[in-house]
């Protein structure tokens, strides 16, 4: 099995992005959703991306953004990948002609396989925890046994991951990648370098044992 990749999401500061890179993260996530405590503006995002070395993917997270708002951000910020975390349809996601991943909030009874097929051009599907009225960043894990094997898209596992549970999550789901935000923070939007290191060490150990 290929090595599981990793994304540190909710980056708001250059130093946190560099801590993620130093720990070995493959990608960093920037939240463009004003209601999130981890939201960044265009100026912050540009500065963070400018500080990244080559081959680290910058991901922009959006929640039901208007075409005008999202288009203005794309004109100003050199994002590598878009992450749609709201109720966007496949047509909505594909309208920007950029690589994208679609987040699904998982609850019992969901047909994850069918949901993957509903976004045929997605680069991957991110699975997060369903909490009513909250689009993401809940800090709560969902029941990993709900994720079937053999899905049609690469799976990015999110939702309540921490340095303590990510190894078990990888062993159970065998995802393409894992995505963490609150599990490596010392406060909302402020990352903890030691927790990032611990998370990445757990991912590496899992990769070495597979």
UniProtKB/Swiss-Prot annotation:
It comes from the Bacteria. SUPFAM superfamilies: Ribulose-phoshate binding barrel. One of its GO terms (molecular function) is phosphoribosylanthranilate isomerase activity. CDD domains: PRAI (cd00405). InterPro entries: Aldolase_TIM, PRAI_dom, RibuloseP-bd_barrel, TrpF_fam. Gene3D superfamilies: Aldolase class I. Keywords: Amino-acid biosynthesis, Aromatic amino acid biosynthesis, Isomerase, Tryptophan biosynthesis. The keyword Coiled coil does not apply. Coiled coil: none annotated. Pathway: Amino-acid biosynthesis; L-tryptophan biosynthesis; L-tryptophan from chorismate: step 3/5. GO terms for biological process: L-tryptophan biosynthetic process. Its EC number is 5.3.1.24. The keyword Transport does not apply. It catalyses: N-(5-phospho-beta-D-ribosyl)anthranilate = 1-(2-carboxyphenylamino)-1-deoxy-D-ribulose 5-phosphate. Pfam families: PRAI (PF00697). Belongs to the TrpF family. This is N-(5'-phosphoribosyl)anthranilate isomerase. The lineage of its organism: Bacteria, Pseudomonadati, Pseudomonadota, Gammaproteobacteria, Pseudomonadales.
């Amino acid at each position: 099995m290929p090595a599981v990749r990793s994304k540190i999401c909710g980056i708001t500061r250059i130093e946190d992005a560099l801590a993620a890179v130093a720990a070995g993260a493959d990608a960093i996530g920037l939240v463009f959703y004003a209601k999130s405590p981890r939201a960044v503006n265009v100026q912050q995002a540009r500065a963070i991306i400018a500080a990244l070395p080559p081959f680290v993917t910058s991901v922009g997270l959006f929640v039901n953004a208007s075409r005008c708002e999202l288009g203005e951000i794309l004109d100003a910020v050199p994002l590598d990948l878009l992450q749609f975390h709201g109720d966007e349809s496949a047509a909505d996601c594909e309208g920007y002609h950029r690589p994208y991943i679609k987040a699904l909030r998982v609850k019992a009874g969901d047909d994850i396989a069918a949901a993957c097929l509903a976004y045929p051009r997605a680069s991957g599907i991110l699975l997060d925890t369903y909490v009513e009225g909250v689009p993401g960043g809940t800090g709560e894990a969902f029941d990993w046994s709900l994720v079937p094997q053999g899905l049609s898209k690469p799976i990015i596992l999110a939702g309540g991951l921490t340095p303590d549970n990510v190894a078990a999550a990888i062993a159970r789901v065998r995802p393409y990648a894992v995505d963490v935000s609150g599990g490596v923070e010392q406060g909302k939007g402020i990352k903890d370098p030691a927790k990032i290191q611990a998370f990445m060490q757990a991912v590496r150990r899992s990769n070495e044992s597979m």
